Amino acid sequence: MIKKAVLPVAGFGTRFLPASKAIPKEMLPIIDKPLVQYAVEEAINIGIEEIIFITSPEKYSIEKHFEVNEDISKRLTKSGKLELLQKANPEIFSKVKFHYVNQDVQNGLGHAILQAENLLENQSFAVLYSIDCLLNVFPQRLSYELGQFYPFVLEHNKV
C-alpha cells in the first residue's frame, strides 16, 4: 500500500493571477478551507502516512497552515470556542507526518518530484495536485475506490 504522497506546490501560480499575487494558489479558499487542505485530507483518508510538500520559500503559509498554532489554540480554548478550535487545528493532521522540501529553481513537475527522492527511499508513492479539487458527497466511497486502484495497477503493470 502507498504510504507517502508528494504534493508539488512550488509553482508561481501565474494562471491564478492576480489572486495568487499575495496568496499561494494552494491556499485560496474553497468554502472554509484552503484548496491544499482538501488534498491532504483525501490523502489521509486513503491511508497516506507521510506528506511531502515540494515548496518554495515564498510559500511559508502552507507550512504554517498545517502546524498547530499555540496562540490561536489558547485563545479559542479560553473563550470556549472548541468547534472553531477543531477547525483551526484539525485532529486529522496528527495522523500524518509532514515534510517540506524547498525547490530552489522551478524546472517543471518532474524536477519538483525529484526533490523528494531522499524522503521516498525507493518506495511507491502518490503524487497529488492540490489545485485539482473534486468535492464528493460520498468521500469514503471515493477514498475506497482510490485505495483499490493501486493493487490493480501493481498487478497489471508489474510496477
What are these regions (language model features)?
Residues 27, 98-100, 159:
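Conserved beta-strand scaffold positions in the cores of enzyme catalytic domains, especially
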Residues 22, 69-72, 146:
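A glycine- and small-aliphatic-rich helix-loop capping segment at beta-alpha/alpha-beta transitions
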Residues 133-159:
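Conserved donor-nucleotide/metal-binding helix-loop-beta segment in metal-dependent transferases, i.e.
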Residues 10, 56, 130:
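Cofactor-binding loop segments of dinucleotide-utilizing enzymes, especially the Rossmann-like FAD-
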Residues 12, 23, 58:
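A generic "binding-loop/recognition-motif" signal
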Residues 1-7, 15, 33-123, 139:
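Conserved N-terminal catalytic core of the sugar/cofactor nucleotidyltransferase
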Residues 22-37:
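Short catalytic helix/loop segments, enriched in acidic residues and glycine
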Residues 122-133:
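Short beta-strand-to-loop acidic/aromatic patch adjacent to the donor-nucleotide binding site
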